Amino acid sequence: MKRILLCLLWVPFLLSFGLLLAQEDAARYLDALQKKYSGLKDYTVDVNVHFDVEGFKAPDMQAKLYCKPPDRMKIESKRIFFLPKEGGTFNPLMFNKEDFEVKFLERLTHEGRNGVKLKLTPKKRKPNAPQDFILTVDTDRNLIKEMNISSPDGREVKALMEYGHFSDFDLPTRIELHLDMQFNESREFKDFGPPSQPAKRVTGRVEITYSNYKVNIGLSDQIFNETDATKLKKGF
């Protein structure tokens, strides 16, 4: 009887230890991403954005993107440039394990390679910021291949990513966004057509292609001064 009671007392401890171990195991995949891109100091790239969204018509848009990880970016365009704010840019350093609760969901095979699916929930919530990220990570190459983003207001974005190899780094050549959202929540739509109709649920696709990468060229911090920035529209 005493042995049975002793075993029962150990069960909660073993369960909590197992959960802690699972979280640590999940976080190590984020560590691997951080390590992979730790040498990426800056880059420039030409961007083309194509929209196929219900109720929204706009021509393809081109711009040059200047990036300096972890959080500096500038868009240079000859006219207003519209870029989805969620999933529209590549920043592998945004997923710092210190900023998220990380949950391991499953192991899987993705495009013939080993992978895992992780759920990331921000520890600090910001108004209108994403509520959860579901990442599909290629663990053979330490690449984010899919990203599902959900927001408190009901927005859903799925990003599918393709990569090329540039100056020792795997960087996106194409990101395809699948959108499910309220039409009138992005005021930027009004710049390209008549006033929006009453709110309705719409879906669509945005294709972003990248070319002419220049990596670790020593971009000056002055490039990112707001006074020098070309007008940028961000939505979704």
Regions found by a protein language model. Name each.
Residues 36-43, 56, 111-113, 140, ...:
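Edge/loop elements at the starts and ends of beta-strands within beta-rich repeat scaffolds
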Residues 1-4:
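Positively charged n-region of N-terminal signal peptides that target proteins for export
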Residues 18-48, 52-54, 234-236:
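N-terminal leader/targeting segments and the immediate start of mature chains
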Residues 7-17:
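Bacterial N-terminal signal peptides
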